[in-house]
Amino acid sequence: MSDLNQSKKMNVSEFADAQRSHYTVYPSLPQSNKNDKHIPFVKLLSGKESEVNVEKRWELYHQLHSHFHDQVDHIIDNIEADLKAEISDLLYSETTQKRRCFNTIFLLGSDSTTKIELKDESSRYNVLIELTPKESPNVRMMLRRSMYKLYSAADAEEHPTIKYEDINDEDGDFTEQNNDVSYDLSLVENFKRLFGKDLAMVFNFKDVDSINFNTLDNFIILLKSAFKYDHVKISLIFNINTNLSNIEKNLRQSTIRLLKRNYHKLDVSSNKGFKYGNQIFQSFLDTVDGKLNLSDRFVEFILSKMANNTNHNLQLLTKMLDYSLMSYFFQNAFSVFIDPVNVDFLNDDYLKILSRCPTFMFFVEGLIKQHAPADEILSLLTNKNRGLEEFFVEFLVRENPINGHAKFVARFLEEELNITNFNLIELYHNLLIGKLDSYLDRWSACKEYKDRLHFEPIDTIFQELFTLDNRSGLLTQSIFPSYKSNIEDNLLSWEQVLPSLDKENYDTLSGDLDKIMAPVLGQLFKLYREANMTINIYDFYIAFRETLPKEEILNFIRKDPSNTKLLELAETPDAFDKVALILFMQAIFAFENMGLIKFQSTKSYDLVEKCVWRGI
């Protein structure tokens, strides 16, 4: 009997597992040999590239990538250091010390992670009071938290052994536990008498856009009353993620005038001017100098994408430069020769491509027009006596005049003319297309140095082999893919996505079916394109069923004699209808997950609505 009761006991874990709506399967991955080198590059030159050259390409890419990112990391670290220094200068400027008003700092584009560092002064106690939207439901709670943080920070300096914990809004016993802390401005009024120092309070309001503006307004007015105490100085820092006009619109005008008596604005979104963007682009030019060129099409692509993005320009710029470097090394067999030492690997497979380069052919055409010796021309075309090979090596060790002149102009503008509000990327683009003079006309100080700054763009031989470009749109599709168009194109032209059917030992029956019928999603999508905006689900199914190859499908489900369930299904008169319905339901639910259709918000499921369609 006890065994029977034991068997009837519910297994709680099994019961809980049975209530799950879905299951996650983690397939086991094959263990890789640690000694094996996994290089994510493929052999180029129609598969004729040696493994040594593939490895060399990977090593060169890794070197340039590491060098570039080391410089970017250094620039990003400097941004935070520069920002801290700017905020500190504003908090402790001499004009701020003398005026009896708020010292207001608006941090524009802030994600509220900016760290505020205060100085240690012998005659004044500096305290940082940070308030989040959660800590600011009303004026009483804001004041309560502020005074507690002020008292605990000041008392901790007087008595370092005492530890203070952050207060909890839901702690009802907090007031009883801390009766010595008064939740009005009496602590501020008596601060010098209690601690023997002047007081400088810095309020850091985080995520201001989410704080109740009426509460914030009243709290600022309350703090204003502290100006009657000579020993008190108050600074207000507002972390604004949207824009200043949003704050001005929601606070009272009298409060705005009070804040703007002494205020400063800082753009902390890392997009301030062109300073840091110029530094990152300059570091990239330094990384590829003497190795790679940048095409005007590629630089124009960078400018256009950055113009459409105002919040994360530095991250976007780094991403585009990084990806362009990777794609170049991945698809260009000649990238191995950016290190002239590797010229020993130059063979006929490379030389055939060299002789067909447009810039090289143009150069040879010029030699013919100049009536150069026939032997010299033939040695270049046929590599007779290693003529083409030596000519290519000579090209590799030449300096890039474009990058050098771009650095010269940028340095001249900053050091000689004190001009810093220029976009180095735009300057470089104008340099490439021969419009540098017109770009520099926007600064009158450049007019008398036009001859010195002028540059005539030149084409270098074999430049197409060593140039970062966006000719095929690879960067555009990889970094900014058109998801909708890609999905639709892949559903329509599935042959370009799935593996080729022309394989040895391919199952004849499966192959015949695949050649006649597209994948289920592609098969249904053809009908989807032709359907109206609102689709009757039954009519949709009937149309789908009629497009399926009936005989091939029935032959396919009969092909495995060991699968008795499929054989039984094949013998039923409505076998094809059942299979068609299963395929249709799979495709319909896949379309819903992909966002192509949605069921109408009614109890009837007879109709579905198209979410994406072409031509409208």
Swiss-Prot record:
Q: Which domain of life is it from?
A: Eukaryota
This chain belongs to the protein called: Origin recognition complex subunit 3
Name the species this protein comes from.
Saccharomyces cerevisiae (strain ATCC 204508 / S288c)
Its gene is ORC3
As one GO molecular function, the record gives: chromatin binding
- Assembly information from the UniProt record: Component of the origin recognition complex (ORC) composed of at least ORC1, ORC2, ORC3, ORC4, ORC5 and ORC6. Interacts with ORC6.
Provide a GO biological process annotation: pre-replicative complex assembly involved in nuclear cell cycle DNA replication
This molecule's function is given as: Component of the origin recognition complex (ORC) that binds origins of replication. It has a role in both chromosomal replication and mating type transcriptional silencing. Binds to the ARS consensus sequence (ACS) of origins of replication.
UniProt keywords (A-Z) are: Acetylation, DNA replication, DNA-binding, Nucleus
Query: Which InterPro entries does this entry report, sorted A to Z?
Result: EF_Hand_1_Ca_BS, ORC3, ORC3_N, ORC_WH_C
